[in-house]
């Protein structure tokens, strides 16, 4: 049984990242599921938003100014254990494209990295808790990202 997710705008996502994006998203989620040895099939909603909407979400949920690339909203942040519906991830493709140019990498590279980052937040990996937890989270994120890039021929 594959992990499940929904995307609020398949058209926009295909426009920005190509037609095979769903397989890449499934791969990211499956690798995280396997790495964390989860016994359930995680579900999440992937929301594609404009820079304006992302700026509003950033202010509303994180009390920060400006546009960001990814925001995760965890449904079960204070519960013990995980439920199959774990939350929502908001991505801003225009901001990701802008960052890709700035950092000299492909939009797909940043998309997968941001998706993994967002998923880890849904699984309560919070790099802002402490410097030690940031190191563990970023190491785990980099390991998963490297695996995804090796397996996903893009």
Swiss-Prot record:
Its EC number is 3.1.-.-. Gene3D superfamilies: Metalloproteases ('zincins'), catalytic domain. It is found in: Cytoplasm. Zn(2+) binds at residues 117, 121, 127. One of its GO terms (cellular component) is cytoplasm. InterPro entries: MetalPrtase_cat_dom_sf_prd (IPR023091), YbeY (IPR002036). Keywords: Cytoplasm, Endonuclease, Hydrolase, Metal-binding, Nuclease, Ribosome biogenesis, rRNA processing, Zinc. It comes from the Bacteria. Its main location: cytoplasm. Its cofactor is Zn(2+). GO terms for molecular function: metalloendopeptidase activity; RNA endonuclease activity; zinc ion binding. It holds the Pfam family YbeY. SUPFAM superfamilies: Metalloproteases ('zincins'), catalytic domain. Binds 1 zinc ion. GO terms for biological process: rRNA processing. Single strand-specific metallo-endoribonuclease involved in late-stage 70S ribosome quality control and in maturation of the 3' terminus of the 16S rRNA. Belongs to the endoribonuclease YbeY family. NCBIfam families: rRNA maturation RNase YbeY. This is Endoribonuclease YbeY. The gene is ybeY.
């Amino acid at each position: 049984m594959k992990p499940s997710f929904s995307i609020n705008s398949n058209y926009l996502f295909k426009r920005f990242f190509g037609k095979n994006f769903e397989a890449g998203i499934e791969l990211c989620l499956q690798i995280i599921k396997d790495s964390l040895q989860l016994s359930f099939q995680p579900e999440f909603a992937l929301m594609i938003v404009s820079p304006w909407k992302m700026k509003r979400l950033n202010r509303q949920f994180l009390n920060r100014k400006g546009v960001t690339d990814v925001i995760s909203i965890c449904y079960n942040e204070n519960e013990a254990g995980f439920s199959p519906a774990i939350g929502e991830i908001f991505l801003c493709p225009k901001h990701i494209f802008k960052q890709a140019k700035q950092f000299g990498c492909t939009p797909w590279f940043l998309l997968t990295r941001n998706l993994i980052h967002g998923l880890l937040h849904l699984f309560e990996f919070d790099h802002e808790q402490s410097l030690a937890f940031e190191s563990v989270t970023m190491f785990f994120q980099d390991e998963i990202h490297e695996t995804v890039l090796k397996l996903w021929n893009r």
